Every structure is written in C-alpha cells, then in structure tokens.
Amino acid sequence: MPLIDASAKIHPTALIEEGAKIGANVEIGAFCVIGKDVRIGAGTKIHSHVVIQGDTEIGEDNQIFQFASIGEINQDLKYQGEPTKTIIGHRNRIRESVTIHRGTVQGGGVTRVGNDNLFMINCHIAHDCSIGNRCIIANNGTLAGHVTLDDFVIVGGMSAIHQFVVVGSHVMLGGGSMVSQDVPPYIMAQGNHAQPFGVNLEGLKRRGFEKATMHAIRNVYKLIYRSGKTLEEAIPEIEQYAKTEAAVSLFLDFFKRSTRGIIR
C-alpha cells in the first residue's frame, strides 16, 4: 500500500501506486497517476491529470497544474532504463503541460529543481538540468539536456537553450531567444543566436542591489563586451573589482564553470 498521510486529500479517481509516499495536507486531483517511487512533501497541491513517475522527490508547498508530466523517462537515446532521479524543491509553481524528465547516468543521474520557481505553460526541462531558486521560464521555454540555470534567471517565452549551456544568476533572456553559449550573470540577452544587450539593471534594483554594486557590475560588463580585451585579459581587472564588491565574484565563479564559451 502507498504511505499516505491521514490529512492528505486524494480524489477517488487518482491512481497512487504501492510504495508512493504522500505527505501531510497534500491534495491530489482527479485522474492523476503517482508512481511507486514518488515522494510528495507536505502541502503540495497536484491538480487533475498530472503524471509523476520514476524516482521522484517533490518538496513542500508546490503547485502542479493539469497535464504536467514529472520524472518520466527522458528522451536521451542512450538511456536504457538505469535508475536515475528527479528532485524538486519547495514552493514551485509548475503550470499546465510542463514536462520535467529524469536524469541520465552520463549526466550525473539527477534532474534538479530548487525552490520558488515558476515554469509557465508547456515548458520542457530535459534530463540532467539543474535549476536554482526563483527562476521563471515563460510559456514554451525549452531547456535541452544538462542545462544549468543559476538563481533569479528569467527565460522569455518561446526560447530554447542548447545542451550543456550555463546561464548565470540574474540573467534576463528575451522572448524567442536561441541560446547556444554560456550567458554570464547579471546581463540581458536576446536573439537567434542570443547576443548581450547590457546589464539587467531593473532586475537588480528590484532585488535590492546598491547603486555602487550595480555600477561595478556595469563596469565589468564593459570590460567583457566593450573594451576590446579578450576574456583572459579582462579577468585580472574583474578580480580587482571583486575585492571591493562581492557580487562581482559571481563573474569569476561563472567563468570557471563555463565550457561552451560565452555569448558575444
């Protein structure tokens, strides 16, 4: 029998497979399917017609809307049914028809979503993606396998991000963007292929960044994109900014992780 907390509300048409664990005050709507290796944390609400499969852990106070599919077999042709996972944090809003696929052994075995994210209608999050906290992916946004979104990333509607791309914190990607290289933190980018269009100042203001910090970030942006210097030449100057403005260190950490080169 599934382990269902007494306070959970399960619609009689929902199918909860033996072995599933359902936490306190969880709501599961009509015609949902919850697989045997699924764990759902307290306070999460799952609307009708949602399918959750595989070794999937969902945290507390999430909302998952109609026709979403989470933890299903991924679309990597190399996948042979190996045991892999999907892990989702707390307070996420996963809207209608979103798909989040389980990981692959080649990619570390886990597709991971943090806390307080919003995935709008028809988004796709492929195998082995890692999404931080407070990200927004607008309608029909697509993340290919192994993509990393750091914190506070906004992906505009109809955008697609190539395999293995890393998108830094506080990035704003405009709608319809095709992203094939890594996107440094704090910047705005748009296009096919995506190009940088300045610093995401409005987003930084909303998150309480000080004027001096934003000024330093703008100076680093100019070093990277307008000075004519190579990235290797710019890094020593960026390191100097990081000594007085801790937020600038995100650039340095990002460059260490970047494997695809940055957008230009």
From Swiss-Prot:
Sections of the chain in a coiled coil: none
GO CC terms in record: cytoplasm; membrane
Top-level taxon of the source organism: Bacteria
Subcellular location: Cytoplasm
Top enzyme category: transferase
Catalyzed reaction equations: a (3R)-hydroxyacyl-[ACP] + UDP-N-acetyl-alpha-D-glucosamine = a UDP-3-O-[(3R)-3-hydroxyacyl]-N-acetyl-alpha-D-glucosamine + holo-[ACP]
Entry keyword annotation includes DNA-binding: no
Its EC number(s): 2.3.1.129
A single MF term (Gene Ontology): acyl-[acyl-carrier-protein]-UDP-N-acetylglucosamine O-acyltransferase activity
UniProt keyword Metal-binding, yes or no: no
GO aspect biological process, one term: lipid A biosynthetic process
Protein task: Involved in the biosynthesis of lipid A, a phosphorylated glycolipid that anchors the lipopolysaccharide to the outer membrane of the cell.
Description of how the protein assembles with itself and partners: Homotrimer.
Stated family: Belongs to the transferase hexapeptide repeat family. LpxA subfamily.
Protein name, UniProt field: Acyl-[acyl-carrier-protein]--UDP-N-acetylglucosamine O-acyltransferase
Gene coding for it: lpxA
